[in-house]
Regions:
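Mobile cap/lid helix-loop segments that gate and shape the active-site cleft of serine hydrolases
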Residues: 29-34, 45, 151-152, 156-194
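Short amphipathic alpha-helix adjacent to the substrate-entry channel of hydrolases
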Residues: 70-86
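Alpha/beta-hydrolase active-site loop
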Residues: 94-115
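Primarily recognizes the serine-hydrolase "nucleophile elbow" in alpha/beta-hydrolase
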Residues: 119-166
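The feature captures the conserved acid-bearing segment of alpha/beta-hydrolase catalytic domains
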Residues: 168-220, 224-227
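C-terminal catalytic histidine-bearing segment of alpha/beta-hydrolase fold enzymes
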Residues: 212, 217-263
């Protein structure tokens, strides 16, 4: 009703017809890498959806829970392949049960209101990787594949108890006392059985000289265990590379992997 009234007033003042057009997604519309971008709030947290010029059949999408637009070569390539690119900011929630719940609600919203695919590719960079493993293990029926890049896989190594401020942030987000943060909560390896049983494929990119999240202490442990469980995992190692830059300048191997498992 308010829209009709506004259009009528505009027409009387300007003596020209004004038509209201619905946006594809809520929020503020802008451009990102040539594509329509929508910024909005969901459950009081920042969300972004970037829309392909022509959506691929089934409306496939990739979702980042942290660090929108950082090293976006894969996202840009997938947009060209008809994927929606979504971001829902759960960066500082450390993969907590609350974060997992919010992520599920966001995915339901994207599916139910905007008809995006019921299965999503989850893209976890750094600490976003820890969330990706946690969320995927509890939502295996909603996951097409995982793309994790230099992922944090062990909260006891980062931030670790020695970093008292960040460790207290972890405990606060998890609503735990220190002695309640056990290995089955703080290590991604405990998520792998559920992922392997659901045949969730994983692609990983890591630098072999990462000092922030060392490959041998994080993703290589995941790789070995996932293979033991019969899971599909591909690791791309960048020689001489540290934690940054993430991704690949030529993202073709990652994109092809994602396309293979979203058909």
């Amino acid at each position: 009703g308010a829209i009709i009234i506004a259009e009528t007033v505009y027409e009387n003042i300007k003596n020209e017809k004004q038509y209201h057009t619905m946006q594809a997604f809520p929020g503020i519309k802008s451009k990102w890498e040539r594509y329509d971008r929508y910024d909005f709030k969901f459950k009081n947290r920042n969300a972004i959806v970037v829309v392909p010029q022509k959506a691929a059949p089934g409306n496939p999408w990739i979702w980042r829970p942290a660090f929108f637009a950082a090293f976006p070569s894969v996202d840009i390539a997938l947009l060209a392949n008809g994927f929606h690119v979504a971001y829902y900011d759960l960066t500082h929630l450390y993969g907590s049960p609350h974060a997992v719940k919010l992520g599920t609600e966001f995915c339901n919203y994207m599916r139910d209101f905007y008809q995006l695919s019921s299965k999503v590719t989850v893209e976890g960079f750094s600490r976003g990787g820890f969330f990706a493993f946690n969320w995927a293990a509890q939502n295996t029926d909603r996951v097409a594949c995982l793309y994790v890049d230099a992922p944090l896989c062990d909260l006891f190594l980062w931030p670790g108890r020695d970093n008292k401020k960040l460790w207290n942030d972890v405990l606060k987000e998890w609503n735990l006392k220190d002695n309640q943060m056990t290995e089955d909560k703080g290590k991604s390896i405990y998520r792998l059985k559920a992922l392997a049983e659901a045949n969730i494929p994983i692609i990983n990119v890591c630098g072999d000289s990462d000092e922030a999240v060392p490959f041998e202490q994080h993703m290589n442990i995941i790789r070995k265990r996932y293979l033991e469980l019969g899971g599909t995992v591909r690791v791309i190692t960048k020689l001489g590379c540290g934690h940054h830059p993430h991704s690949l300048t030529d993202p073709t191997p990652i994109v092809n992997f994602i396309l293979k498992y979203t058909k």
